[in-house]
Amino acid sequence: MSRVCQVTGKRPVSGNNRSHAMNATKRRFLPNLHSHRFWVEGEKRFVTLRVSAKGMRVIDKKGIETVLAEIRARGEKY
C-alpha cells in the first residue's frame, strides 16, 4: 500500500538530514498517515480511508459525504 493520503494527496517528499558539520544525507519525509474508519450516514456503513492528520481535519470541515464524492470523481477506490 502506498504512503499517500486519499483525501489530500500528500505523499513522501525527499530532503536531507543535516549533521552538526552540515553534511547532507538523503532522507524521506513521510506524511502522518492513519487508517481510519468513518461512518457514512447516507450509506449506513463504515468506510476505511488512509488519511493524513490534515485529511482528517478536511473531513471534519467538509463532511465525509462531500469528501467521498471528490474521491469518486477522481476515480479512486476506497
Swiss-Prot record:
Residue ranges, annotated region (Disordered): 1-21
GO biological process, one term: translation
Annotated keywords: Ribonucleoprotein, Ribosomal protein
InterPro entries linked to this entry: Bacterial_rp_bL28 (IPR050096), Ribosomal_bL28 (IPR026569), Ribosomal_bL28/bL31-like_sf (IPR034704), Ribosomal_bL28_bact-type (IPR001383), Ribosomal_bL28_sf (IPR037147)
Alphabetized GO MF terms: structural constituent of ribosome
GO cellular component: ribonucleoprotein complex; ribosome
NCBIfam families in the cross-refs: L28
PANTHER family: 50S RIBOSOMAL PROTEIN L28, LARGE RIBOSOMAL SUBUNIT PROTEIN BL28A
Protein family per UniProt: Belongs to the bacterial ribosomal protein bL28 family.
HAMAP family, alphabetized: Ribosomal_bL28
Protein name as catalogued: Large ribosomal subunit protein bL28
Species in which this protein is naturally found: Yersinia enterocolitica serotype O:8 / biotype 1B (strain NCTC 13174 / 8081)
